[in-house]
């Protein structure tokens, strides 16, 4: 029995059907706006969601971690803690360096944060040590964000000190000026300097001290104003030879006289041109190098920034000698571009598959062209809105457009199928278009707004995850909205002009065969549907079981935060015993580097040893392993990491921690592994008590891998205990003691050499090669009040102690970070549960506070809001459907399709070994919007048949199911094929796209089968319930 359409006159589509020229030009305008907008859209890996972050670095060479903490970090933290909009403040105080990282609220502009930081630094200046070589320097950069570009500068003919000087003045400064660059660091520590190495025995023999030498040097090298002479006729500027420029000048410097004979600096010290810090070194593929790391500002577009650097590099390298080679070792934009290209290909493949399925069902070229035009028009038109909203072409927006391919064609399919049905019945194309479009208009509006309603909760997600998916949700919603407009305007107009009874009746052998196939399928479906309607309670039991199963799967499926991406770059930390020297650490780094470079997947390697703003201690080395492009290696990054760690396990005395770089960086500190867990206390003593037991328990957990802590309190220290009474009797102050020690062992920067292009330091130290270790303290001499020379050992004793290698703070309190990775056979959710269980078993005191950080903290936050996100999507859709249908009952019938989609998605994820992460959850939310389309198409026609033809509910829903079977199948397959390329993705960034495709394909497959039977049964059950309520509560009939 055929359901007859109501007599309508085209509704909102009538104007566009009757005015084809205006409609065509309107669509051309949308197309041109999208094409123009596409050209202005920037390209990036992900939407820009970085927290405004500023790093403040203060260098104090020779200072211990305790001194750096109390003299530099603490005063700065007190001022920074008063800034408004500050989200988190972390600091690391190591030997000679203080690094404070300030993370602000997402809503605070970075420029405003910069002004607050500068004001806080100015306020703290008076509290900082007076002998700081340089004031605190801030950079608009997140230290945990990997460099966007790494360059290695090498030379076999020129000393590395000269190479660094050229690179710093000619290359690094120019790159720093590029828009979007936050910080350019030169790893390698080869800044030119004049190094003065005192001979302790020679000084002692001459009755001098290191302080005498320091004072002589600082007094002999000055660069200050001298004034000018203003005569009656002319003015003369005064200058003098007050500066010493070379090591030879310093060798000839007279530091004292003895018996009338001059004592020159060269008599008591070796003076040479060298590096400012001899305990820093960088290597590129085992060759000594200056490694230039370029980091972007938070929020800057990585592609634009890298392109600008690439454009200026040829000009910059031309200014360097030919023997100096500049090599780009890593460029994160290479993988970003490859990932975007792969996603663009998947988008085009999805479009092709969707058009193919349309032709398969319609078996008519003109009828296929119409939705074939609607798809690209809807997608391209979206670009214009994206430009207006300052979006970018990134993996998430392209994923949204790929998924939208299956969505946007649905509306056109529903319109074409309905109009074609009237043409086949003998209606004229124009009359059929008016009648079909008018009849289906409300359905299109229902489909569109109910689907957009699902996306509304994504727009209100908080914190960084909400920012991340805002572009995804808005892009998808815009594409769907444009699709609805196209389907109600262009599609019926084209149907009126391109379709005819003859074109639809024209069939070839394939068309006839496929028609017979579909007729048989519909007949089989009709027979099964009759049986199902005869056993409604059994079908209802199946529907309820899917709901129960979806809840069970939701609870037990492994959960994660964000897929681990293979971006072709691995960040590594090499850990050695805490008392290791620079030379020993450099040799261990060389051994490990030679092993890593032998791996077939590795293309290049940079490594760094020493203490600076990113590396807290000498016993740590930083590595960056650059892999070959994905199509040139056999293994993904996680496999390569496992292989490298196994290979390095054979090197004694080192531990290697590796993690792949990610496009999404939430952390604010450089970590050894992917995830972090912190312990915070009021004192370092409390941490020293509780960190070891917790660390040992976590290392025994199978859910965790590479567990380590940054708590290092076994560094060797020489504690010099001065007899203050004896020192006072001799007229020696504690300042005299500190100065003597600093002069000998602190690589003290005692003077500055000024040139037209740069400034260079004079470094003072004691030559310890003859007397290494603690014996060098016996050579320290002090001057008493009567001018006598007093050895340090006469007034002090030396004790060996252990000391922390660094002191870390979080929001001004001591903290230690436990880093961990998750093994392949476990999920982040299971790892988090294991950590919480270990924490509870230890029963921490109240002054110990624990918290996950970075990605693991974001995972906890996202996990807590996931259920509410799904509930909000369902509630939003119920409200929209209730308003559209003016009914409390029919939206429930439509929403009854959701459990089947949830079960299908969760089963697919489980079978594929994929975690339920935020990407997969977005897929499930989209399924909520997709699968209800089946029910809407059925219920709309059933209600029309009841209302306008007087059919009983069972006959109405039965006929509606048969009548809408083909468009339901078409739209579901279109959505499925739109997601299929994502599920089968294998290229760069596939880890990000695959969970979305798996969840959607699995959910669509199962829901397509079940909802064809469960929806009509639930429709009839609710119809009976409605009648029962009307009889029992006749006064509420209208409300029901």
From Swiss-Prot:
Q: Which GO terms describe its cellular component?
A: plasma membrane
In what way does this protein cross or attach to the membrane?
Multi-pass membrane protein
Keywords for this entry? Answer: Cell inner membrane, Cell membrane, Membrane, Transmembrane, Transmembrane helix, Transport
* GO MF annotations, alphabetized: xenobiotic transmembrane transporter activity
Annotated compartments: Cell inner membrane
Where on the tree of life does the source sit, at the highest rank?
Answer: Bacteria
Q: Which SUPFAM superfamilies match?
A: Multidrug efflux transporter AcrB pore domain, PN1, PN2, PC1 and PC2 subdomains (SSF82693), Multidrug efflux transporter AcrB TolC docking domain, DN and DC subdomains (SSF82714), Multidrug efflux transporter AcrB transmembrane domain (SSF82866)
Give the main location: membrane
The transmembrane segments are: 16-36, 342-362, 369-389, 396-416, 440-460, 472-492, 537-557, 863-883, 888-908, 911-931, 968-988, 998-1018
Q: Name one Pfam family in it.
A: ACR_tran
- InterPro entries this protein is in? AcrB_DN_DC_subdom, Acrflvin-R, Multidrug-R_MdtB
PANTHER family linked to this entry: MULTIDRUG RESISTANCE PROTEIN MDTB (PTHR32063:SF21), PTHR32063
**NCBIfam families noted in UniProt:** PRK10503.1, RND_permease_2
Q: Which family does it belong to?
A: Belongs to the resistance-nodulation-cell division (RND) (TC 2.A.6) family. MdtB subfamily.
Q: How does it assemble?
A: Part of a tripartite efflux system composed of MdtA, MdtB and MdtC. MdtB forms a heteromultimer with MdtC.
Q: What is this protein called?
A: Multidrug resistance protein MdtB
